[in-house]
């Protein structure tokens, strides 16, 4: 599963997810993409489950790009622990996703295959997503 090798600080504030994505909201590598339509914290487990679903569906066919990385630590306290005595230890990692962010990109497969792969992948995610196609300008 994805997680940073080294971070400057072990713990972070939760923060807020205001507005829509200003970066990472256009297709950069592939021909087809899965785009988030809601704000969410995507865990490294959810990203991995989605990646496995897409790669299993397209087999040796296309190339897949994961456009999100879980770089925010989420802390949790042990069960049945009294309040106080500081913040809990980091439990898992999340990627902060805003509406409009591209999650996965794929190329090298027919559009129907890519669309079905992304549909199956979207079932692994806790948000609504949409399938988008790169705008190719032929000259």
From Swiss-Prot:
InterPro entries: Ribosomal_uL16 (IPR047873), Ribosomal_uL16_bact-type (IPR000114), Ribosomal_uL16_CS (IPR020798), Ribosomal_uL16_dom (IPR016180), Ribosomal_uL16_sf (IPR036920). CDD domains: Ribosomal_L16_L10e. Its main location: plastid. GO terms for cellular component: chloroplast; mitochondrial large ribosomal subunit. It is found in: Plastid, Chloroplast. Keywords: Chloroplast, Plastid, Ribonucleoprotein, Ribosomal protein. It comes from the Eukaryota. The keyword rRNA processing does not apply. Pfam families: Ribosomal_L16 (PF00252). GO terms for biological process: mitochondrial translation. One of its GO terms (molecular function) is structural constituent of ribosome. Residues 1-17 have a biased composition (Basic residues). The keyword Oxidoreductase does not apply. SUPFAM superfamilies: Ribosomal protein L16p/L10e (SSF54686). Belongs to the universal ribosomal protein uL16 family. PANTHER family: 50S/60S RIBOSOMAL PROTEIN L16 (PTHR12220), LARGE RIBOSOMAL SUBUNIT PROTEIN UL16M (PTHR12220:SF13). This is Large ribosomal subunit protein uL16c. It comes from Porphyra purpurea (Red seaweed). The lineage of its organism: Eukaryota, Rhodophyta, Bangiophyceae, Bangiales, Bangiaceae.
